[in-house]
């Protein structure tokens, strides 16, 4: 096992964890920003990939849980009981705190009032989604999440809506995303990165079986649980392809997008398939080990220039990395998708992963090298400040605001609507949004099935609902046109 100093550096000219001269690590979601050196005596996270710089505790999570637990236990006797036939809605949850902000939604921690289970709740403002042409993406993500469940995914439990927002309630993972830990200058060991590669390999293998290309695998979209296991999230630009089909749309985050996506967009051709997600895993793994990505690509780069870049620039590997890890990264970062490592079988055959107990891994019986500090909530505390101070429609004031809006709408002549188009879109979303309850679905699957009665004879043929039409996800159609992303 190498020291933390060895794991970042590649030469004496650059300090460990620093980009080469003239290549500063960019800020923002595409890449982590450098932080000042740690103060003396600052705590270090337990890891074979340790931490150089840890911030002061943002949130005493264990104390908060203890305090909330005592107050909630007193209320357990009067815990609400919701009608099982009633659709889940906003009133079924207690909002605890804001923890994040996505591409077009926000995330908070919630507790379901009847079961006291904790979840993360993502909510997206309908009007903003319409204005940003994101309605189709939200509906596609819902369609996908309602059909999948895996140990290394962030799984959907409930979806519902109100007049303002669409809600997705998912697994709560308290370990933070890998982008956050990169920004905290966590030095990930090879063993830790190997585990992430394996866990993502199992997730991608499952998604392939469901005909799903994620298209946005990156540190921002990989969340850790309290024990340090990795889970893939954010399916808002994922796509479903049938056997033999290829995707063609330019979709993803540029620094993590595979060369064939750019090539397909610029030169046409046959498109791309599941191999693109494995390239992204390679970029992510390289970044976790070195602190910056293998290619100097940013969102501002022209697509045409990126096609040229992959044929002219070679990836540089750190001499201190093991030859097995370098070989694994080379296979993941192979420009030609036909020669790229891009299946679970390929990964399992890699020498770098020869000792992995895959059965134990799929049951989370392999202990991660990096375990997030349980005394902190691993997110930016400004999210909660923004929600409380800057947000014009804060979630904690929703009930009062909706009641006020309802009263105002009832007193106004509907024929004087300022924006008929917007209202038509909102009405279409209200009608087409799919409500989902995985908890109820699991209960119904566990019930013993009674034998079906013999069908009665019918004098006249009854119309039969078309199966494809029944299973198709309704969209806003011509009212709220959104670009597809095949």
UniProtKB/Swiss-Prot annotation:
The modification Phosphoserine is found at residues 10, 15, 18. It is an enzyme of class 2 (transferase). InterPro entries: Kinase-like_dom_sf, Prot_kinase_dom, Protein_kinase_ATP_BS, Ser/Thr_kinase_AS. Changing residue 376 to H: In a colorectal cancer sample; somatic mutation. The active site is at residue 216. Coiled coil: none annotated. Keywords: ATP-binding, Kinase, Magnesium, Metal-binding, Nucleotide-binding, Phosphoprotein, Serine/threonine-protein kinase, Transferase. Its EC number is 2.7.11.1. Residues 1-56, 396-419, 444-486 are annotated as: Disordered. Residues 396-405 have a biased composition (Basic residues). GO terms for biological process: intracellular signal transduction. PROSITE patterns: PROTEIN_KINASE_ATP (PS00107), PROTEIN_KINASE_DOM (PS50011), PROTEIN_KINASE_ST (PS00108). This is Serine/threonine-protein kinase 32C.
């Amino acid at each position: 096992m190498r020291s933390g100093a060895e794991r970042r550096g590649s030469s004496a000219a650059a300090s460990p964890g620093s980009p080469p001269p003239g290549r500063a690590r960019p800020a923002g979601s595409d890449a982590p920003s450098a932080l000042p050196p740690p103060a003396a005596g600052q705590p270090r996270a337990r890891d074979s990939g340790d931490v150089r710089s840890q911030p002061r505790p943002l949130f005493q999570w264990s104390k908060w849980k203890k305090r909330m637990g005592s107050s909630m236990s007193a209320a357990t006797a009067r815990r609400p009981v919701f009608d099982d036939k009633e659709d889940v809605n906003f009133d079924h949850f207690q909002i605890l705190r804001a923890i994040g902000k996505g591409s077009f939604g926000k995330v908070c921690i919630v507790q379901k009032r009847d079961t006291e289970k904790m979840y993360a709740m993502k909510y997206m403002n309908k009007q903003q989604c319409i204005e940003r042409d994101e309605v189709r993406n939200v509906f596609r993500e819902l369609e996908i999440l309602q059909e999948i469940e895996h140990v290394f995914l962030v799984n959907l439990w409930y979806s519902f809506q109100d007049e303002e927002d669409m809600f997705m309630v998912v697994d709560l993972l308290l370990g933070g995303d890998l982008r956050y830990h990169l920004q905290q200058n966590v030095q990930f060991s090879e063993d830790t990165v190997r585990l992430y590669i394996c866990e993502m390999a199992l997730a991608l293998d499952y998604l392939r079986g469901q005909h799903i290309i994620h298209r946005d695998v990156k540190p921002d979209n990989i969340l850790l649980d309290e024990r340090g296991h990795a889970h893939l999230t954010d399916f808002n630009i994922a796509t479903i392809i049938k056997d033999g089909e290829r995707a063609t749309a330019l979709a993803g985050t540029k620094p993590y997008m595979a060369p064939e996506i750019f090539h397909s967009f610029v030169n046409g051709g046959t498109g791309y398939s599941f191999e693109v997600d494995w390239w992204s895993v390679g970029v992510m793994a390289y970044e976790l080990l070195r602190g910056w990505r293998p290619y100097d690509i940013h969102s501002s780069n022209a697509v045409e220039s990126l096609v040229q870049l992959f044929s002219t620039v070679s990836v540089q590997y750190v001499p201190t990395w093991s030859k097995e890890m370098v070989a694994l990264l080379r296979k993941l970062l192979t420009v030609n998708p036909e020669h790229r490592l891009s299946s679970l079988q390929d990964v399992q055959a890699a020498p770098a992963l020869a000792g992995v107990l895959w059965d134990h891994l799929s049951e989370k019986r392999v202990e991660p090298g990096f375990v997030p500090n349980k005394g902190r909530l691993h997110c930016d505390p400004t999210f909660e400040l923004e929600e409380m101070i800057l947000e014009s429609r804060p979630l904690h004031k929703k009930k009062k605001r909706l009641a006020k809006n309802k009263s105002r709408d009832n007193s106004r002549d509907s024929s004087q609507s300022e924006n008929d188009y917007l209202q038509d879109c909102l009405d279409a979303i209200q009608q087409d949004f799919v409500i989902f309850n995985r908890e109820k679905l699991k209960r119904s699957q566990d019930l013993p099935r009674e034998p079906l009665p013999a069908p009665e004879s019918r004098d006249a043929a009854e119309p039969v609902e078309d199966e494809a039409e029944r299973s198709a996800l309704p969209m806003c159609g011509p009212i709220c046109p959104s670009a597809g992303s095949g």
